Every structure is written in structure tokens, then in C-alpha cells.
């Protein structure tokens, strides 16, 4: 609430102090242990659009621009892996108009990634995780093109969860394991937590150190259920298009102050 009141004050009045505080936070964050993997539930696009008396697709468009900013922040700080929750399997239940608009936006953005100079300059590999078969063919083609164009890169990794559900990911992994047991490729005695990890959508990806949810809701919404068992969770009362670099830095700074016990 306080943030939303402050956000209406002309920025010119506090920009010098804001910039100074941002530089201070960057210095502090860079001097500490940085997370290797950050995951974000990008919530609040539609409510942000509603606040501005715009249709839902308008909020998703501005959300995609915010994601581009966050990729720059990660590059600046040296955070190698970013996973974002873009569209869940449950989101298909939204209105046809909104889903169609979103699919068109996804197609456009994945095609833009192929020619984005920053992607190739920074060496960003793009992975799309989820049940891709549920996506329209035009989106699947754009996804495959982006993945193919960036497959050789390994400096930074962007995982986009699309037509994704955490439970579905676990179910799909279990089915693949069962097939390998039946075919004789795998013995039941070999199955453990680490083996199951190898059957997830992105095998052997380090677990997220941090999970951020914007939009003010305090829930996980079926996101990376297997991978976030020991992640540090942060819930921010800011719509995703309004999520600021200073918010991101504060979260990382708080993460650096926490003692991670990993269930011990």
C-alpha cells in the first residue's frame, strides 16, 4: 500500500536519493554471496492493467518488458540462472481472447529472442519447460527456434515455464522412469531423489536459491514443486510491471543475511 502511494509522487523529487540508495545496495549485494538461481512467479500483470483501465493483454505486454529489465539485472550481478513462471496449465481456463493474445505475445517474444543482440552477446541459453504439446503450433515453432538458436550458450540460462504445472512435471518424470524400468534400462533399486531429478523438464538444473512472487499473493501456485523444497521464499506486494531493481536488490540482500539450513 505504501509503495503504491509513493509511486504516484513525481520521481524527480526523490530520484537522486533513490539512485544513491540503489548504488549502495548494488555495492552491498556484490560484496556478498550471490544466488546462482533465481525463480520468479510473475504475478499481477492483469491487476496492474485493470488499475490503469486497460485490457489484460496490456499488462502482459508490460510484464514482458519488465522481464527484459530483470535479465539485465541478472547479467549485471552475475546471476547465471533465471526461471520465470509465464503461463500455467491452469491458465488455459482463462477467456479465449486473453489466451489467444498471450499466445501471440509468446510467439512474438520468442522470435525476438532469436535476433536479440544481448542474448548472443551475453551467451544466454533459452529453455522452455512445460507441456509444450498443449501450445499452438506457431508458438511451439517459435520456442523451438529460440532453443535451437541459443543451445550452444552456457553463460546464462533463462528457463521459461510455459503450459507448466509442478505436479505435471513430477507425473511426467515418473511416467518416463516407469517406461525405463519396464524396458529394462533402469532397476527399481536405482530410483532415488537424484535420479528423479534427471527426469525433470531441465535435468540436473540447480535448485532455485530464491523464489520471488510479485503481486501480493502468498502462495506457490504449483510452481517448481520438486525443486523449491529448500529455496528461500519472498512475497512482494508489488504488481510485476511495477517491480523495481531496488526491490530485487533488497530481496537478494535479505537472502544474504539468512542462514540457510536445508531442512537441518
From Swiss-Prot:
Homodimer. The active site is at 43, 91 (proton acceptor). Binds 2 magnesium ions per subunit. It comes from Pyrococcus horikoshii (strain ATCC 700860 / DSM 12428 / JCM 9974 / NBRC 100139 / OT-3). The gene is uppS. It holds the Pfam family Prenyltransf. Its cofactor is Mg(2+). Keywords: Magnesium, Metal-binding, Transferase. Mg(2+) binds at residues 43, 232. One of its GO terms (molecular function) is magnesium ion binding. Belongs to the UPP synthase family. GO terms for biological process: polyprenol biosynthetic process. The keyword Methyltransferase does not apply. It is an enzyme of class 2 (transferase). Substrate binds at residues 44-48, 60, 88-90, 92, 94, 213, 219-221. Its EC number is 2.5.1.89. Catalyzes the sequential condensation of isopentenyl diphosphate (IPP) with geranylgeranyl diphosphate (GGPP) to yield (2Z,6Z,10Z,14Z,18Z,22Z,26Z,30E,34E,38E)-undecaprenyl diphosphate (tritrans,heptacis-UPP). It is probably the precursor of glycosyl carrier lipids. It catalyses: geranylgeranyl diphosphate + 7 isopentenyl diphosphate = tri-trans,hepta-cis-undecaprenyl diphosphate + 7 diphosphate. NCBIfam families: uppS. This is Tritrans,polycis-undecaprenyl-diphosphate synthase (geranylgeranyl-diphosphate specific).
